[in-house]
Regions:
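Membrane-integral, polyisoprenol-dependent glycosyltransferases
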Residues: 1-180
């Protein structure tokens, strides 16, 4: 029986990534102090819920249009489900970081055809400081990056096809729209 190296045994890729996801984005998530950007975003979502105005985001009664609405709506839904729960707000950003890394893994696999390369690249992405910081705090940038990675992945799939695949174009457009 020939022994397959660990990195080429593809059934271990997803469990290994899941383990790194848990360590990077979810374990001991409440230990980091809330920064000013995180606080502003959560206050905006909280006002959206308490004022029952889901279309016009405000902070302290003033319009706040600097950030895209989708992450604010996600934070507002979390606020409805569990008010003042910062670890749950951060877990949503962690899920977006997981989505980013999984789309990156799929994209690297399609681009190179080498799943070991995709695993190593995804592990490097998942353990980079900026991605860990965005995935562990309730800021909006990780959502933009995750949805845009999905758009890039589906656009790449579309452009590699010989025939026009409208569902892939639509998926790329939807993910691109969600990132803004």
């Amino acid at each position: 029986m020939t022994r397959v190296p660990f990195t080429q045994n593809y059934r271990w890729h997803l469990p290994l990534l899941l383990l790194v996801f848990c360590c990077s984005f979810f374990i001991n998530n409440g230990a980091i102090f809330a920064d000013i950007m995180e606080s502003r975003n959560i206050v905006t979502a909280r006002e959206m819920v308490y004022d029952h105005n889901w279309l016009v985001p405000t902070m302290n009664g003033e319009l706040r249009l600097e950030k895209p609405p989708l992450p604010t709506w996600i934070a507002a839904v979390v606020e409805v489900i569990s008010p003042d729960n910062l670890p749950l707000q951060r877990a949503m950003a962690g899920l977006a970081a997981v989505m980013l890394v999984l789309f990156f893994y799929k994209f690297a696999t399609k681009l190179t055809g080498n799943r070991t390369y995709a695993l190593v690249s995804s592990l490097i992405l998942c353990t980079s400081y900026n991605i860990i910081l965005m995935g562990r705090t309730a800021t909006w940038d990780i959502y933009c990056h995750a949805f845009m990675m999905g758009a890039i992945y589906y656009l790449y799939l579309t452009l590699r096809q010989t025939a026009c695949k409208w569902p892939l174009f639509i998926a790329a457009g939807v993910f691109m729209g969600l990132s803004f």
